[in-house]
Structures are given as structure tokens and as C-alpha cells.
Amino acid sequence: MFRCGIDYTRCRWILPMLLLFAIIFDIIAIAAQSGWVEDQDAKTHYASMWKQCRGRNDQWDCKSLMEFSWAQAVAALMIIGLIILIFAFIISLVALCSTVNVSLLPFIGLLLILAVIVQIIALIIYPVKFNEQIYEGYYDYTWAYGFGWGATILTLGCAILFCCLPRYESEITGLEKTKYIYQSG
């Protein structure tokens, strides 16, 4: 695949493992309660995908963000992206780890591209709508929001690789013909 010496047979195990990491990152982003955004000092206001909390010290007043349609859309899109990602992971295990089924690889790539599109939409809607409706000063995006972007970037990379792998079917399956370089003269 690349001239720098990547072994094709290792791709059979690396790609599902990368998808597993993307799933874990997505779960962390979706389940995080500490917030996707927090105020500048992280002392008076923070908001996760599900709720926003205001207060000081240990006295926090939390309200659900699910009353906003944009927050419901973000939650739905992130969960749909996670479900598509899990489905693609299961298919990749079947396609690559038991027997190499190269015909499934472009389908997995398309599923992953769909998951990327859905999650990018969610990750863009959240800060735009948060700034329009809740913004009260300077906010920082936290590690949980970063995990959402990390999962999306990993998924995009895997999608590209899954779309490119069918070109290297003989190398992946180990049926590559030996190429001899010689000069006649």
C-alpha cells in the first residue's frame, strides 16, 4: 500500500482496532458529565451534551439541555453516528479478521463516511447554537468535546483506508505474485 514498508496483513487487525478506539472516544464524548464547554475559570458555568450547570463551589444548579431542539438534534446525531460506527466495526471484524472479504471494504468505508458526516454536523451545531442561545462570556471547549472530534477524525482516517484497501487485495490476502527485477544484456 505504501512504499515505506507497511505490511498489508497487519492492516487486517489495525483497522478494526482503530475503529474500536473511535467507538471508545465516541462513548466518552457522549457520556461525559463534566461538560463539553466551561466558562473561562471553570468555576461558574459548564455544559455537557445533556445538561448545563451554574453555581459556585459545591452548589450547582443543573438544567437539562434537552428542552432545546438543537441539543436533541446533537444528541440524536452523535448517537446515530455511534450506532453506525459500531455496525461498521462489527462488519470490519467479519470482513478482515476471520476471512478476508474485500467486497465488504468499500461498504464499510461508505458507512464510516456517513458516520463522519453525521458527527461533524453534530459537533458543529453544538457550539454554534450554544453561542447563540446560552453564551454569557468566554468559554473553553473541554476534553469531552475533543474526544468527539478525535473519534470523528479516527473514523475519517479509517474510512479513507477502507476505501483504498480493495486496490491491494492480493497483498492483503497474501496472494501477491513475486516481482523479479533483472536486466538482460
Swiss-Prot record:
Bilayer topology: Multi-pass membrane protein
Any Pfam family matching the protein: PMP22_Claudin
Keyword annotations of the record: Apoptosis, Cell adhesion, Cell junction, Cell membrane, Cytoplasm, Membrane, Transmembrane, Transmembrane helix
Transmembrane segments: 13-33, 74-94, 105-125, 143-163
GO cellular component: cell-cell junction; cytoplasm; desmosome; plasma membrane
Factors inducing expression: Induced by UV irradiation of early stage embryos, this is partially dependent on the presence of tp53. Induced by tp53 expression from 10 hpf onwards.
Family: Belongs to the TMEM47 family.
Name by which UniProt lists this protein: p53 apoptosis effector related to PMP-22
Lineage: Eukaryota, Metazoa, Chordata, Craniata, Vertebrata
Gene that this sequence comes from: perp
